[in-house]
């Protein structure tokens, strides 16, 4: 079911300024913003075979500084989400971007787990 870790994400109240800090301080090269209404909501930098992402705190529903999230790469997000729902897990609606599909759910401890399916 799980193939790989797709990305690690930090929540950010201001993705643009946080991205600029990571670019300046750590030399990360981000691939391009995903924006809504002119606001940078998500951006990622390739790091080895995976990537590091900055994501608006409203998407991940966590405040900055509250920990790292994990996103597991799957072959078929619809099938995986259905399987989880059938097992009684409350899975969020699948969100589609120009490059991927994403959904999330909480583990038994309340940690947010994300499923990711690349569409590129």
Question: What is the role of each PLM region?
Answer:
Residues 1-19, 68-70, 119-120:
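N-terminal beta-strand motif that seeds the catalytic metal site of vicinal oxygen chelate
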Residues 40-42, 69, 100-102:
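Short hydrophobic/aromatic beta-strand or adjacent loop that forms the aromatic wall/cage
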Residues 43-44, 59-62, 94:
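Short secondary-structure boundary/capping segments
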Residues 66-81:
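Mid-chain, well-packed structural core segment of small domains
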Residues 49-53, 62, 110-113:
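Short, charged/polar, Gly/Pro-enriched secondary-structure boundary elements
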């Amino acid at each position: 079911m799980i193939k790989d870790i797709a990305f690690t994400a930090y929540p950010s109240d201001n993705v643009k300024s946080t991205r600029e800090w990571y670019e300046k301080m750590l030399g990360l090269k981000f691939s391009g913003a995903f924006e809504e209404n002119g606001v940078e909501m998500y951006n990622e930098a390739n790091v080895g075979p995976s990537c590091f992402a900055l994501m608006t705190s409203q998407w991940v529903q966590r405040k900055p500084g509250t920990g790292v999230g994990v996103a597991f790469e799957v072959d078929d997000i619809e099938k995986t989400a259905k399987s989880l729902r059938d097992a009684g897990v409350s899975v969020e609606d699948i969100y589609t971007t120009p490059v991927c599909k994403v959904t999330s759910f909480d583990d038994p401890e309340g940690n947010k787990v994300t499923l990711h399916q690349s569409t590129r």
